[in-house]
């Protein structure tokens, strides 16, 4: 099982892209939850943040999970109902491109959505820890 939030959501998505992990490692993945992930880095090229990131179009595409085929692992994207529109869009486009589930968590935003991981009875934990 893998879960990651925001940039960590990007990292767990990249691990799910074909060719990123050795087969003996990827075969052990049973469930992945990107939480408010960055899935398409291309829009960052046109922001002030790119002066630090130095993304080219080529590198943004190369590092964007939505531009790659995912491994066949049970995946569900989680995002807060009160996220900024850009994060909602990132979650929606990842779910659409990867044809995986999308949970929009009621009354949650970017910083408190991970509180779901503190409650073993939350929908997120139930999903993560259900028997495969």
PLM features per residue range, with description:
Residues 1, 33, 76-78, 103:
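Hydrophobic/aromatic beta-strand patches that form the interior of the parallel beta-sheet core
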Residues 5-8, 16-17, 29, 63-72, ...:
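A structural signal for the main folded, soluble domain(s) of proteins
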Residues 1-48:
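Primarily recognizes the serine-hydrolase "nucleophile elbow" in alpha/beta-hydrolase
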Residues 37-67:
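Mobile cap/lid helix-loop segments that gate and shape the active-site cleft of serine hydrolases
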Residues 18-20, 49-52, 93-97:
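Glycine-rich, phosphate-binding/catalytic loops in enzymes
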Residues 82-86:
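Acidic catalytic loop of the alpha/beta-hydrolase fold
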Residues 88, 92-95, 99-132:
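C-terminal catalytic histidine-bearing segment of alpha/beta-hydrolase fold enzymes
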Residues 71, 77-80:
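Short beta-strand/loop motif that positions the catalytic acidic residue
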């Amino acid at each position: 099982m893998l879960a990651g939030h925001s940039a960590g959501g990007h990292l767990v998505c990249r691990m799910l892209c074909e060719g990123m992990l050795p087969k003996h490692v990827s075969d052990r993945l049973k469930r992945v939850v990107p939480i408010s992930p960055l899935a398409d880095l291309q829009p960052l090229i046109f922001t002030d943040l790119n002066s630090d990131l130095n993304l080219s179009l080529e590198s943004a595409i190369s590092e964007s999970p939505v531009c790659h085929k995912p491994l066949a692992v049970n995946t569900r994207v989680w995002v807060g109902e009160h996220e900024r529109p850009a994060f909602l869009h990132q979650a929606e486009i990842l779910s659409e491109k990867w044809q995986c589930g999308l949970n929009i968590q009621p009354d949650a935003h970017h910083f408190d959505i991970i509180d779901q991981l503190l409650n073993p009875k939350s929908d997120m934990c139930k999903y993560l820890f259900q028997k495969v």
